[in-house]
Every structure is written in C-alpha cells, then in structure tokens.
Amino acid sequence: MKALSVRQPYACAIAEGLKNIEFRSKPTSHRGELLICASKSAKGFKTDDGIMLPIGCMMAVVDVIDCRPMTEADKSEFGAPQNIDGWWAWVLNPNTGETVEPKNVNCSISFFNVDDELIIPIEEGKMWADF
C-alpha cells in the first residue's frame, strides 16, 4: 500500500479523525487508500494523559478523495500553514479512517510502499496507546 509519513501530532489527529486535510507543498494525483505513518521527527509530543505519541510507525489507513490548492478558508484547519501560497490541500475522507497496529516502519519524505500483509487493523475499542 502507498504510505505517507506525517509529523506528530498531526499523524495521530488524522488517525483519530480530527484532521481531514493534510497540507503539502506538492500536489498528488493519488486517490484512494493511503497508509498514514508517524514520522521519526517531532519527538516529545504527549497526549493530555502524558502518553508519548508514537514515532516511526504506522497509524491509520485513510482515503484521499481530492487534492486542490489551499484556500484562505483552510487557514482555520488544524496544522494549516498561514501562508497559503504554493500549498496544497490533500482532502481525506473522514468516514473511512481505520486505525492500524503501530508497527515500526522505515518512513520516507515522499510516498513509499508498505507490504499489505504488515498492515493490521486494530480491534474496535482499542487505540495505538494500547500497544
């Protein structure tokens, strides 16, 4: 499956359905399933309960449904850059996110591939912090 690394806390926000637009400096023609992985950078983010957010691992499978230039209205979105020039909004379907076991993965700056057999959905009622 195609995968994309996203910095924390944004990777968790996408996995939890709280962030439905990923902002990137380049557009994508990709539509459909995309594995969101937490990048190895941006260490030190914690939940309100003090649990460290995971890094360098799989987080969720989402559907990319659109890619468009960023608009002024997007500035209010979680994680949005304030200068919209040259930024793209990768629109994710908020109803299709599926949290997966947070297995370690070698992330890359651009798209990379992860073997489908390694992607295991988490049982209902569990979250990444349960692993």
Please give the residue ranges for each predicted region:
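Structured alpha/beta reader/binder surfaces that contact nucleic acids or chromatin modification marks
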Residues: M1-F131
